Amino acid sequence: MKLAYIVAKGNFEELMMSIILTMTGSAMDVEADIFFTFYGLNLLKKGGADKAKIKYPPILRTLGTKIFKKKLEKVGYEKPSEMLKKIVETGKVRLWACTTTMELMNVKKEDLIDEVEGIVGAATFLDMAADAKHVLVM
């Protein structure tokens, strides 16, 4: 089975949801393509995944993120950047950066983490997603 994910928000919740779902899926022999677009692209920038913050509540964003990360660590989860590396190392998960978003946000290929499989446009990603059983939007 194959799934496709679109990560369009740069917050911690969407990042962790996509990581945990693809990590679980890879253990079940499920392949996944994850397309990072708009603010989600920031998660693929070097250091970006570890800087991601929770979305709500805005007044507690920094403290809430710190508490959430500590709880995840306590139950055995690693830093988001390490988890991204591990899901790619399974050989079942591929990370894709959006060409248009990179141009709009002036992001260069060298700004991205090494785990990015490639830089593709929406049409290319839709071709990839055409044979996916489900497309999940984060």
Which residue ranges define each predicted feature?
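Short glycine-/acidic-enriched loop or helix-start segments at secondary-structure transitions
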Residues: 17, 44-46, 106-109
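Short hydrophobic/aromatic patches at helix-to-coil boundaries
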Residues: 135-138
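A glycine-rich helix N-cap at a beta->alpha junction
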Residues: 53-82
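N-terminal beta-loop-helix "entrance" segment that forms/cooperates
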Residues: 40-53
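A charged, amphipathic interaction segment
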Residues: 77-123, 127-133
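Long, hydrophobic N-terminal alpha-helical segment
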Residues: 1-40
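Short, basic, glycine/proline-bearing loop/turn elements
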Residues: 4-9, 65-72, 109-111
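Short, hinge-like loop/turn segments at secondary-structure boundaries
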Residues: 50-55, 113-115
